[in-house]
């Protein structure tokens, strides 16, 4: 069986599900074992994308849901063109959130059109496909009570 030397791994999960802990622990393992890797997050990644992240997550900005989607996709476009394609098949690429989160939050959470989201995402990522998606689950009841 053919194994990719440098896979692209996406880490998905709702807030407080352990997603960030998982990606950080895996990063430590890779570093300890001297694997070449990069770790990025969405939104974020490039300097420009980190600025977009600040705008999107600022409580003082009440963004329209379409604006929110387009900013996330702008961040992804920057990541794909400036980080992912540059490092593809040269380093292991770890990504904290990607397309699945966009569908979950913007379609199922905000009610935006699924076909529009998928079409825009396909336009941005082109032929790029991640090799593996790791999903961190948590019981919703436990998630709700952790913030009470």
Where would I find each of the regions flagged by the language model?
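Extreme N-terminal, non-catalytic leader segments
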Residues: 1-7
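Hydrophobic anchor at the beta1->P-loop junction of P-loop NTPases
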Residues: 11
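Walker A (P-loop) phosphate-binding loop of P-loop NTPases
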Residues: 16
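Conserved lysine of the Walker
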Residues: 19
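Hydrophobic positions on the alpha1 helix immediately C-terminal to the Walker A/P-loop
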Residues: 22
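ATP-dependent small-molecule kinase phosphotransfer cores
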Residues: 35-125
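Short glycine-/polar-rich loops that comprise or flank the Walker A/P-loop
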Residues: 128-132
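Conserved small/polar residues in nucleotide/adenosyl-binding loops
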Residues: 138-145
């Amino acid at each position: 069986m053919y194994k990719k030397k440098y896979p692209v791994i996406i880490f998905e999960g709702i807030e407080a599900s352990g997603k960030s802990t998982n990606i950080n622990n895996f990063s430590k393992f890779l570093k300890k074992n001297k694997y070449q890797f990069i770790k990025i997050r969405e939104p974020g990644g490039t300097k420009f994308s980190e600025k977009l992240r600040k705008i999107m997550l600022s409580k003082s900005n009440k963004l329209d849901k379409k604006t929110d989607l387009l900013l996330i996709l702008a961040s992804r476009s920057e990541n794909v063109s400036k980080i992912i394609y540059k490092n593809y098949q040269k380093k292991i690429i770890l990504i904290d959130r990607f397309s699945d989160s966009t569908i979950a939050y913007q379609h199922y959470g905000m009610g935006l059109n699924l076909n529009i989201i998928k079409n825009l995402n396909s336009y941005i990522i082109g032929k790029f496909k991640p090799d593996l998606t790791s999903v961190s689950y948590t019981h919703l009841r436990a998630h709700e009570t952790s913030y009470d």
